[in-house]
Amino acid sequence: MAPTLRRTSPLPRTLLVGLLGLSAARAAAQCPDGAPPPCRGASAATRMHPVNPQLSQHTWIVVPFTNATRTADLDWLRDASVNLLTLDLGQWSDIRVVDDKHVGDLLRELPPARVAQPLTLNDGVAIARRAGAGRLVMGDYFRIGKGARFIVNVFDVVTGKRLRSVTHDSADPDSVLGAFAPIARGVLALPPPPDAKLGATGTTRVDAYQEYLMGTTALNRFAVDTAVVHLRRALALDSGFALAHYKLAVAMHWTVDRSSADAESAHALAASRLSGGLPARERALINARLAIASGENERACEGARTLVARDSLDVEAIYTVGECEYHGGRQIGEPIDSLHGRFRGNWNRAIASFRRVLALDPTYHPAFGHVVDMLSPPVVVVCPANPTPGVSCGNDPAVWIAVIIREGDSLDIRPVRSTGPDYGAQFRRATANRSRVLNLQAARRIAEDWVEASQHGARSLLDLGRLNIQLGELAAADDALRQIGKDADRQTRVEGLEWRLQIAAQRADGPGGLKLLDSLGRLMVTTTDSEMYASHAIVYGKLQPIHDVIRRLGAASRWPPERVQYTLDVPRILLGVPDERFLQDERAFWLVAPGDSVCAAGLPTCRTSFLLPSLAYASNVRRTWWPPFSVETWGYRFEIARGLSMNDRAAVVKSMEWMDSSSHADNRVLAEESSLTALALGGALAIGDSSRALRYARFATDTLLPYLYDSGVGGTPGGAVYYKPAMAPRLMLLRAELEAALGSRDEARIWYDRVLSLWSDADAELQPVVARIRAARAALGPPRD
C-alpha cells in the first residue's frame, strides 16, 4: 500500500453514475427490515448536485491555519489546527462544528494551486458556504521563541465581516496542544458549559499527536501497515490517547494477522474507556467501532445513523454505517422460519453508504475495500453458533447459506438452510443470470476506479489483480500486481507476491516463480507467513519448507508419529508423485487415528476422514488395502475411492460423470470447482479409461488453470498451510503423460517442458522424479518440423 497523492479531479464517471451498478434506488432486493421486495416506503436515491446548503449561524467551520513564519517544524499544525480546534469547539451541544474530515473534502474542491497556498478570506468563505456554515474560523501562527503565537479570527460568512479576534501564546512545544482550549473559549466568546472538558484532544504530547496524524493519513489512503506503525508509536508515547486507540482499532480491522480481531476489540474498548473528555461525535464513533468489534452491528448502525441524521456530510459516520451494514450482512438475526433466515445487515444499504462516501471523498480508500468484498464471493456462509458436535460448518445442517444473486442493479441475498430446497433454487437462478460473472466484472470496474482515484495505490492494485485472476485474465492481473512497489506496506507486498506466484504456476514460469519465492521469503515475519511461503514453495519442487512446518505443527499439537509421517507424504500425493511408501504410512496412521472405524467417511468422527488426501488424490495407485467403506460416504471426495474399494466400476463412472458435469457448470459461472476434474481424472486412470482421462486433463489444463484454482483440500490442522498451488504441476504432468501414451507427442513435449520449468530447481527428494520426466521427454524424439 504505497503512499499516494490526493486526487483533485472528480471521481470517474463510471463510479458516480453507476457505482457497481448498485444504487440505493435498487436496495429493494433486500428491504430495510430484511424482508424480500417489494418494500414499503422505498424511494429512489437522487443524484448529488453541488448545491450549497442553507447557511446557519449555529454551524461553525475551521479551515487550516497559515504558517506565517514558514517554520518547517510547525508545518504539521496547518492541518492539525482544524482537528484540534474542531474537537474543542465540538464540546458545545448548541452549535454544530463541521468535522475535520469533511473540511479536507471541501478543500479538494479548490483549484489545486490554491490548496497548498495560504487560504484567503474568499477561499474560506467559499468553503464555509459549501458546508452551510454561517461562522468561519481562520488563523495564523508564528514562531515565538520555542513556542508559537496564534492569531485566530471569526468571520460572519454572510457579510464577510470579522466578528472577533483571539490571540494566544504557547511558551514551548509541549504547550501547543493545550493552546486550543483557550482559543476555543475566545472564538465562541462564551464560558464553557459546566460539564465540558476543554483541551480534550486525548493527549498532551505533541509527538504522540503527530504520530496520530500520520497514522490517520496513512489509514485514509489504505496504507494499513504504515497506519498501524504510527498509531502504535502514538500509544507508546501516550497510552491514554483515546483517538489513537480508536483509529488503531479501525486499522486492525483490515489486517490479516490471526490476533488482529482481539487487538481490534482491545483498542476499541480502550478508546471507549478513555473517551470521556472527547466531543459527543467522537464518542459516538468510538462506541460504534466498539459495537462493530463486538459483533453488535445493529447497535453500531443505530449510533452511526444518529450522527448522519445530524450531519449528512459526515463522511466518517456514513462510512461507519456502511461498515456495520456490511458486517451485519454476515450475521443471522431472528430467522423468519426454520428454513429461511434474516441478516442483521443489508449489503445494498452498505453499498449505498460506501457510494455516498466516495461521492463526498474519492480519496477515502477504505470505502472501496468492502464494496469489492461484497461482489467477489459467490455465496455468504454463516456457520451455526452452536455447531453439531463433530460436524464441520459446511456439512452442518444448521448452516445458513445465501447465494449472491444479481437482479438488475442490486443484490438479492436471502439466507436459507443448505439442506432445504431454496438453496438449489438460488444457485440455479444465479447461474441462469450469470450473477457471479456480472458481480466480478462490476467489482473489477470498481477496482479500476479505485486504482485511478488512489493514483495506483498498492491496495487497489492488489484487489484489481485478484479480480482479474478470478476472471481468468492472467496478463492483466500480472500487470496490475507488478505495479505494487517496494514502498508498499509489507502486508500488501506479501499478498501481491502470493498472487504473482499463483500466476507463475499457472503459466509454468519456473524461473520467474523462484525469483518471486525468494522475494517472498525475504518478507517473512510471522508464523503464518512461513506457512503460506511453504504452501507456494511446493509448486516449485521445494518440499523442505512444508516439511518443517508439518513437523512444527505436529510437535505443537502432539501428533502421534504415524500422523506426522502421513502428513509429510501429503505434499507429494497432491503433486501427483507420491512416495512409494505412502500406502504403508496411510495404513499405519489409520490404525492409530481417533474416531470410529465403521462410519461414513467425511464425518469428523470417522477415522477414514483423516485419509482424504491419499484416498481422493491417489485413487489411481494400485492398492492391497482399503479402509472400511461399508457405510455411504459423507462428501463426494470419497465416492470414487469407495467405488474402487468395492470393485464397482459403474459407481466410479457415475461419480466421475457427476464431477465432470458439476465442474463444467461451476466454470461457466466462474465458481471455484474444488478440484472436481482432478478427482474425476484420478478415477478414470484407476479404471484404465485413458481417453476419458485425457479429456478431463485437457479441460483441467486448458480451461480451469487460467482461473483461480481450488484443490478442494483444506490446510493442515492448526496452521495456515494450504495445498491449492500443488494442482498446477500435478495436472500438467498428468496431461503430458496421457498425451504421450495416446501418441500426441508434440502436446506431450509442451506439457513435460512446463513441469520441468516449474521444477527446474527442485529439492533432492524430487530429483529422481525430474530425471524420469526428462527421460520421458527425450523418448518422444525431436519435434516435427
Q: Which stretches of residues belong to each language-model region?
A:
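Alpha-helical repeat scaffolds
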Residues: 262-272, 299-306, 335-356, 383-416, ...
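Short coil/linker segments at helix-helix boundaries
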Residues: 208-441, 445, 711-724
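A structural "domain/chain start" motif
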Residues: 29-95, 103, 204
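Residue at a conserved register position within TPR or TPR-like alpha-solenoid repeats
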Residues: 218, 252, 291, 325, ...
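TPR alpha-solenoid repeat register
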Residues: 244, 317, 367, 425-426, ...
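"A position-specific structural signal for the A-helix of alpha-solenoid helical repeats
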Residues: 206, 213, 247, 286, ...
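Catalytic-center loop of serine/cysteine hydrolases
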Residues: 34, 39-49, 83-88, 101-223, ...
